[in-house]
Curated annotation (Swiss-Prot):
It is an enzyme of class 2 (transferase). The chain crosses the membrane at residues 15-32, 35-55, 61-81, 102-122. Belongs to the bacterial diacylglycerol kinase family. Its main location: membrane. This is Diacylglycerol kinase. Its cofactor is Mg(2+). The active site is at 74 (proton acceptor). GO terms for biological process: phosphatidic acid biosynthetic process. GO terms for cellular component: plasma membrane. PANTHER family: DIACYLGLYCEROL KINASE. It catalyses: a 1,2-diacyl-sn-glycerol + ATP = a 1,2-diacyl-sn-glycero-3-phosphate + ADP + H(+). A divalent metal cation binds at residues 33, 81. Signal peptide: none annotated.
């Protein structure tokens, strides 16, 4: 296997390349993953609401952080699904487990949003 042409880059060029890859990842997720688009919409609604609520700065930061956490988990879940599908589209118990575990992680992240927001708003 030949070495990656991107290894060894440093400084501004590395940062610019990494930013480009990140933006490409966001775009791929937004275009190809309905769940990611739904979470973006949820964040577009909840984050401004967090600024409108009469809560402490710490509570507001926590409310926003858990919303962003769900986006992070969905990006990782989508990456797992893409990798599994790239390896083989054949049904296999390990492939199912990998995809189900990614889905479970997203379920936990959404539960964290619900519990956090409910605790702050009802607390």
């Amino acid at each position: 296997m030949s070495p990656s042409p991107f290894k060894g880059q440093t400084g501004l060029k590395r940062i610019l390349n990494a930013t480009g890859y990140s933006l490409a990842g966001f775009l791929a997720a937004f275009r190809g993953e309905a769940a990611f688009r739904q979470l973006v919409l949820l964040n577009v609604v909840l984050i401004p609401v967090a600024f409108l609520l009469d809560v402490s700065r710490g509570e507001r930061a926590l409310m926003i952080a858990v919303c962003l956490l769900a986006l992070i988990v969905e990006l990782l879940n989508s990456a797992i699904e893409a990798t599994v599908d790239r390896v083989s589209l054949e049904r296999h118990p390990l492939s199912k487990n990998a995809k189900d575990m990614g889905s479970a992680a997203q379920f936990v992240a959404l539960t964290v949003i619900t519990v956090t927001w409910a605790t702050i708003l009802l607390g």
